[in-house]
Amino acid sequence: MGFSDAGIYLSDPNNLCQTELGFFHEPSLGFSDQSDPQNEFHITPPIYQELQDQDLEPKSQETNNCSRKEGATVKKEEEEEDDYCKTPTRSDQILSAMPRICPPAPRKPKRVPSRSLKVRNSYRSKRMIILNVSREIDCLFNPTSLCNKIKKARYI
């Protein structure tokens, strides 16, 4: 639920007392008994009005001094910037409107296999010799040559 009176959110630009002291002179519920639209702004008591008038004079002098100092510092900063960095204005220094195509990202080179593996693999792939050595193996383990001394193992 909102308030119908916008006066609690607005402040008079000439009234510095409420911003300095940090409080408003409105009722806490936001309703005002005033019916005049010009008096919707906050009312300052006479004590605060005197303080406000005294405070305004030094502040106006300070703001004028600050603006003069700021103007001087801005001019100095502009001069310093002109000395150091300048935007290129020649036609050969200006970047082209067409974006350049970037080269592909660098990749890790493939590992070269060692020569010893290369030699071994090349012989295997090119020369495949199939040997049948079953007869030689049978001759080595022939039961007649062992003189029937083969004993069977006993299982426990």
UniProtKB/Swiss-Prot annotation:
| Entries under InterPro entries matching the protein | CDK_inhibitor (IPR053115)
Record field: compositional bias (Basic and acidic residues):
67-77
Record keywords, A-Z: Cell cycle, Protein kinase inhibitor
Annotated PANTHER family: OS08G0516600 PROTEIN
Sum up the protein's function in the record's words.
Probable cyclin-dependent protein kinase (CDK) inhibitor that functions as a repressor of mitosis in the endoreduplication cell cycle.
Name of the protein in question: Cyclin-dependent protein kinase inhibitor SMR10
Give me the ranges of the annotated region Disordered.
52-90
Molecular function terms, GO-annotated: protein kinase inhibitor activity
